[in-house]
Every structure is written in C-alpha cells, then in structure tokens.
C-alpha cells in the first residue's frame, strides 16, 4: 500500500513530533560562528527549524525520498539538502557546527562506521568547529513493572490516519533493536499494517569521546536533553576540532 511504503510519512510519524531537543540545537547554532551541517536529517525536523530562524543550514541523509521532501519544504529557506552517507560524504565547504540529532551516530553499524563518520565530520569542520551528537539508551526510563502500554505516534494526512507503536525493545548483538507496529487507515476505513525494526549501536558518551582523538576531535563538556513523558532523555556529546 502507498502509505505503508512511503518513508516520508513514517519518518514524519515517528520523528516529527519530537521537540525536546530543539532549544539546545538552536542554542548551539546561535553560538557557532558560521554555517551548520546536519547529518541524518530525515525530512528536516531540526534543519527546517534552524533554517526558519535564519541560520545557514546544509542537511544530508542517505534516503533520497526524505531529502526530496526536505528540499520541497525548505525551498524558501537558507537551506541546502543533499543525499549522502554520513560515513562517506564530501562537500566543498566547512562548517562551524555539525549536528547529529536523535541517535544518528548509533546507526553507523559499529566502531568502524563511526570512525569513518568522525573522519568525514572532522574534514568538514572549520577551525575550532564543533560536532554535537545525541546519544540515548532505549532501556533508560521507567522500570518495566511501572510502565504502561506505550502510546502510538499518530499523524493524519489527506484523510489517512497513520500510527506507529513501539511494541518491543530487544537486546541484540552489539546494540538494541526497537520493533514497531505501523498501521495506516485509509479514508474509507481500510486498515493495513506491517512491522518494522531499527537497530541502534550500543554506545555511551565515554566511548564516543574516546574515539574522537583518532579523528582529530577533542571532547568538550557534555549537554543533556531531559526525558519527557513520551521520550527518553539524551546526552549530547560535543567534540571540537583539535
């Protein structure tokens, strides 16, 4: 079905409503003396927010459909979007700030992928530029015996209702898998559903900070994004170009 197959819709459903980290990204962008690059930008939750406030933003994602949606949404903003892998991108400019929100650095496929990503980031940082990366542990939060059923992420669009509900969080080799039930209800009431999983590398702040020097990056004091009723909190690791 169209709804179940559209990555733009599901990215908007599962990521678009999160706002707890936006004040921190705005603060970091305001303190940066130059343009901002977001890697793993998706449909532009953060990039559009920053560009809408006048920041010069470039945004990359490996999914062409997500980038096409972002380019359309940001057509009138100081925003450039492109398709690229975070582990191998090459741009003709440098940035005062590079950001990786929502656990993007935990999608690199382990230490080797992170090393490639960090090298790319360092190559694109201006002198004294900063890389800011969000980390989270899906097992953090309320003890299982105290937790109620998770609420679905829901979005209505063109008469359709889309919902995505986390149904399991599993330990897997090298990380954590999050299973979600995706449901799409058409305007005439037809229900279609499918399962999807995303795997996050096990990664803590100390490990990422320890990997920085090999890429020419040194750790700055961390920042925190508090948990909300619907989302776990995150640690923002800051690495400065050495």
Q: What is the meaning of each model-derived region?
A:
Residues 96-112:
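A short SAM/SAH-binding and catalytic strip from SAM-dependent methyltransferases
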Residues 132-206:
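SAM-dependent methyltransferase
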Residues 1-42:
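Conserved class I S-adenosyl-L-methionine
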Residues 87-97:
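A short acidic, Gly/Pro-enriched loop at the edge of an enzyme's catalytic core
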Residues 44, 48-88:
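Class I SAM-dependent methyltransferase SAM/SAH-binding core
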Residues 115-127:
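A short glycine-rich, Lys/Arg-flanked "PGG" loop and its adjoining helix->strand segment in the class I
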Residues 199-242:
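C-terminal lobe and adjacent flexible extensions of AdoMet/dcAdoMet transferase-like proteins
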